[in-house]
Amino acid sequence: MTTSCCQINCGGQGDIAINVQHTKPPKINHDLVSNVCERPSVVARCPVAAIRPALVNGKPSLEVDEKKCICCGACFPPCPPMQINDAEHSKLAIWVGGNHSNARGKPTFQKLVASGIPNNPPRWPEATAVVKKILKTYKEDAKDWERMNDWVERIGWPRFFEKTGLPFTKYHIDNWRGARASLNASTHIRF
């Protein structure tokens, strides 16, 4: 199991990952930006070009185009004054089926199975309930030594949602046109 502070998921490709899901663009503390942040790096870090340099009260700062912002959180590590964490609007998402290893097959990417889960520390009861539901179903149905991704691949994603009782929504459909069937996930060279 892995955790990550945003959907970029540097936590890796664990069997189950719990990630923070930001739902609002960052709030900028303009007084600190010029002293703390290297502005060109922050602008370059945004995957959708939603951040641009600005002057606020005569000081160099940054501004966010909220229509473009996808709330990924990539701007926060290089510029902490761009606070994206929010007690009310930051939610949790659970991803399943990742595997970096290529010992028995190619590596697999995680898939979103639950999103918009309330972020209620310190025990996170809603997230814990979803993870327990997944683990209980996995324990009952998986073969010995079968990883989560192998189990899901064997039964299929529709059966996974059916067995776990998790709701299937339009956000679970991988419809990104830029992906190929394998996303060249294998470490083997192909010509």
For each feature predicted by the language model, list its residue ranges:
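Peripheral terminal and linker regions in Fe-S/redox and tRNA-modifying enzymes
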Residues: 1-191
